[in-house]
């Protein structure tokens, strides 16, 4: 049984859509047990109204406290009000009561709270947000860092590339995932110092399948499985993608249902293809983004998540836990550290033939 903590009070439509999404996930999967952290008086009636068949799979952990969008000083909040729904969910993961956490709360709040409570992996220098997204070619891609760090060093992006590769292999079942660097041109000489130096690091790493630079207009058609950039650039790219896809679907729906005849024709002729198109490009199909680099699996669901999207975020969390992604990243970090230490030893050790010869004669 996989155990997941849910911040029931985080998100634009909490707790209603969070509870509905949780129950939807539980109805789909009997291997899950969830702990809902939030106001029991609000949560219990929602559970009673929703079709649900596994009472032993859900446990409510009552707290009347939660973090709102106006709460900015998370360090102070953690000291003065440690029993908010998010803090308690993360603390449960820290104490090994659960194996993962899902929240649709504010991104920076979740990142900082996760960092303070769960801590980074011992050898991980930065946390990254790694969302996945669908496109017209039925492929799922990973984009990172999508907002955890507005400023990064080339070494950080190099590290992210290695661990996104593990996720692509384990979760997306891609044997040799290709990585590309999001940039303003495809030539190696394009970009800021960050892109230029990162390009060199990725090119020199024989463990990576690096495919060079990728321009933003190819976001949905790129040959890459992983797109890499700093948090500022990648976050803009992600939000542009999400907004474009949702507006496109809404606009198409308005055109095809403008009058009664169009509604009938759409339902008769285009319902199945439109559903296929929606499944291909709807950002809600993925559910959430992993906070890469923490000691436990933490998934950031979209703030505007409704039940289906939140359900997908929970199922994604379960998949990451079952695949033991964190353990594999920790192992990769350890191997990389050992290689680095060996390289340092080789570079610092010097052989002096004369000294060696003198020692032998004496």
From Swiss-Prot:
Catalyzed reactions per annotation: a fatty acyl-[ACP] + phosphate = an acyl phosphate + holo-[ACP]
GO biological process: fatty acid biosynthetic process; phospholipid biosynthetic process
Swiss-Prot/TrEMBL keywords: Cytoplasm, Lipid biosynthesis, Lipid metabolism, Phospholipid biosynthesis, Phospholipid metabolism, Transferase
Pathway named in the protein's UniProt entry: Lipid metabolism; phospholipid metabolism
Record region (Disordered): 343-362
GO molecular function: phosphate:acyl-[acyl carrier protein] acyltransferase activity
EC category: transferase
The EC number(s) this enzyme carries: 2.3.1.274
InterPro entries: FA_synthesis, Phospholipid_synth_PlsX-like
Localization (cell): Cytoplasm
Domain of life: Bacteria
One term under GO cellular component: cytoplasm
Self-association state and partner proteins as the record states: Homodimer. Probably interacts with PlsY.
HAMAP family for the chain: PlsX
NCBIfam families registered for this protein in UniProt: plsX
The family this protein is said to belong to: Belongs to the PlsX family.
Physiological role: Catalyzes the reversible formation of acyl-phosphate (acyl-PO(4)) from acyl-[acyl-carrier-protein] (acyl-ACP). This enzyme utilizes acyl-ACP as fatty acyl donor, but not acyl-CoA.
Protein name: Phosphate acyltransferase
Organism name: Aster yellows witches'-broom phytoplasma (strain AYWB)
Encoding gene per record: plsX
């Amino acid at each position: 049984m996989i155990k997941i903590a849910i911040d029931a009070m985080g998100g634009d439509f909490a707790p209603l859509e969070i509870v509905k999404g949780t129950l939807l996930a539980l109805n789909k999967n009997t291997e899950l047990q969830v702990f809902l952290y939030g106001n029991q008086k609000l949560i219990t009636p929602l559970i009673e109204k929703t079709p649900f068949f596994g009472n032993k799979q859900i446990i409510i952990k009552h707290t009347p406290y939660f973090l709102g969008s106006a709460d900015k000083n998370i360090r102070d909040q953690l000291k003065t009000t440690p029993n908010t729904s998010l803090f308690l969910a993360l603390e449960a993961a820290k104490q090994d009561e659960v194996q993962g956490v899902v929240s649709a709360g504010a991104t920076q709040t979740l990142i900082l709270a996760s960092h303070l409570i769960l801590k980074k992996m011992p050898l991980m220098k930065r946390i990254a947000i790694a969302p996945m997204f669908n496109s017209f070619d039925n492929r799922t891609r990973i984009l990172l860092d999508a907002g955890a760090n507005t400023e990064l060093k080339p070494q950080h992006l190099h590290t992210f590339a290695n661990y996104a590769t593990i996720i692509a292999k384990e979760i997306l079942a891609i044997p040799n995932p290709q990585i590309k660097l999001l940039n303003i041109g495809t030539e190696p000489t394009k970009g800021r110092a960050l892109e230029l130096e990162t390009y060199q690091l990725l090119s020199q790493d024989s463990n990576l399948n690096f495919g060079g630079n990728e321009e933003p207009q190819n976001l949905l058609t790129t040959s890459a499985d992983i797109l890499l950039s700093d948090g500022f650039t990648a976050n803009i790219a992600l939000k542009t993608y999400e907004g474009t896809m949702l507006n496109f679907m809404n606009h198409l729906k308005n055109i095809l249902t403008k009058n009664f005849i169009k509604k009938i024709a759409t339902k008769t002729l285009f319902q199945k293809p439109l559903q296929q198109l929606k499944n291909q490009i709807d950002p809600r199909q993925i559910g959430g983004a992993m906070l890469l680099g923490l000691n436990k699996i933490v998934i950031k669901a979209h703030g505007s998540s409704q039940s289906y999207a939140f359900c997908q975020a929970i199922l994604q969390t379960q998949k990451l836990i079952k695949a033991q992604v964190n353990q594999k990243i920790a192992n990769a970090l350890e191997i990389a550290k050992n290689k680095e230490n060996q390289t340092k030893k080789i570079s610092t050790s010097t052989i002096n033939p004369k000294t060696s010869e003198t020692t032998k004669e004496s």
